[in-house]
Amino acid sequence: MGKETPAEKSLNLIRGRLCDPSYVFRPLSASSDSNYSKLKFIVSTSITEGCNNSMLLLGPRGSGKAAVLDLGVGDLLEQFPDSVSVIRLNGLLHSDDNCAFKEIAKQLCMEHHLLFSKMASFDDNSQFIIAMLRACGLAHKTIIFVLDEFDMFAQGKQRLLYSLLDAMQSVTSQAVVVGISSRLDADQLLEKRVRSRFSHRKFLFLPPSREELDGLFVHLLSLPADSGFPSGYVSRFNDKIKNLTSDTRFKDILKTLFNANSTVNSFLKFIFCAVSLMNLESGLLSLENFKAALSSMQRQPKLEAVRDCSVLELYLLVCMRRLEVKEQSSYNFISVMKEYKAIHDSFHTSDYYAQNVCLRAFEHLRERQVICYAENRGQSQTGEYRLQKLLISASELHQGMRSHACCPAILLKLLDH
């Protein structure tokens, strides 16, 4: 393999940054008022002062709850390497109490180099966990229980939550329970006996501000001056990034992106797409890269459905649209076939199919939810007599047909007139 060019090297560097949560969330966590700072302070207090704590991290998926927690726990593990033990559960995997207790016992055994018994009963595992909490407390070691998909644990009898929180009432225990959930009402799901033992400390993960986004954008994409890149290339690359942040067209792209999804995770995917489209000859990111990235992020299933239609199905869709233009808001297969025959008779098109073939294409459109029944009445009627309606707008149909690989030119003409 040949030597990497500066463009290839910068591409690999930025991709590595985007895949490293600690690098991504470090600048967002710099403020003393950030969730990272508050969370780290509470957990470090539990470690240094030997007290128990519980908290919830709430926010939409992709907002960085788990990443910020991992960042804080990672820093504490470096600061107190022999005083912290982390147990991780996921509600999608361990919502069953028996399974959850067994998993906790297994992770505790691995952490403390003990033998784990697969045959241990629920009571055995429960007693073992309580004994380990007591022993770790006496040894001034804090156990951090991370419960991802916390709302899944807040269903049923909630024995796991009750047992953990009840054991933390003991003077000798030293533990922190951190719940992570995308449900903002997760604490309201708790039973009264569990809620009374929970601290009700909640951290909300809100979308980043515009200033934070600009700072994150520069942080992720700027090249360091002392990284082995040619100095001229670094200055050109970084100047291009700064110019983009002040470009109104780029701001409009970001606005469109965040109207659909305002999470950090969505922003990272957007940047990753743009970086992957970078021209390796120039080695610089352009506005066009970000426009293309936005297009790839904006899934348009209706347009995709039109692009995947057969030519016959396109004819049927155009017929239905023409009937709507004629102020015929609802129609059945029979009236669509009359319009289809009228088009064939007027323009002598070669794409003319038998009625039974057209009916199968019509049913296929309904199966793909491009069209649907106009009303629930008339269920006793056969499919070709029931009223139908289009589920796509005229602009979506036109756009989908223009990007269709085999769309006959006559259909676009018929759609416009």
Swiss-Prot record:
One of its GO terms (molecular function) is DNA replication origin binding. ATP binds at residues 59-66. SUPFAM superfamilies: P-loop containing nucleoside triphosphate hydrolases. Follow a cell-cycle regulation with a peak at the G1/S-phase. Isoform AtORC4a is expressed at low levels ubiquitously. Isoform AtORC4b is mostly expressed in siliques, flowers and flower buds, and, to a lower exent, in roots, leaves and stems. Keywords: ATP-binding, DNA replication, DNA-binding, Nucleotide-binding, Nucleus. Pfam families: AAA, ORC4_C. GO terms for biological process: DNA replication initiation. Induction: Regulated by E2F. Accumulates rapidly after cell cycle reactivation by sucrose addition following cell cycle arrest mediated by sucrose deprivation. Gene3D superfamilies: P-loop containing nucleotide triphosphate hydrolases. One of its GO terms (cellular component) is nuclear origin of replication recognition complex. It comes from the Eukaryota. Its main location: nucleus. It is found in: Nucleus. Belongs to the ORC4 family. Component of the origin recognition complex (ORC) that binds origins of replication. DNA-binding is ATP-dependent. The specific DNA sequences that define origins of replication have not been identified yet. ORC is required to assemble the pre-replication complex necessary to initiate DNA replication. Component of the origin recognition complex (ORC) composed of at least ORC1 (ORC1A or ORC1B), ORC2, ORC3, ORC4, ORC5 and ORC6. ORC is regulated in a cell-cycle and development dependent manner. It is sequentially assembled at the exit from anaphase of mitosis and disassembled as cells enter S phase. Interacts directly with ORC1A, ORC2, ORC3, ORC5 and ORC6. PANTHER family: ORIGIN RECOGNITION COMPLEX SUBUNIT 4 (PTHR12087:SF0). This is Origin of replication complex subunit 4. It comes from Arabidopsis thaliana (Mouse-ear cress). The lineage of its organism: Eukaryota, Viridiplantae, Streptophyta, Embryophyta, Tracheophyta.
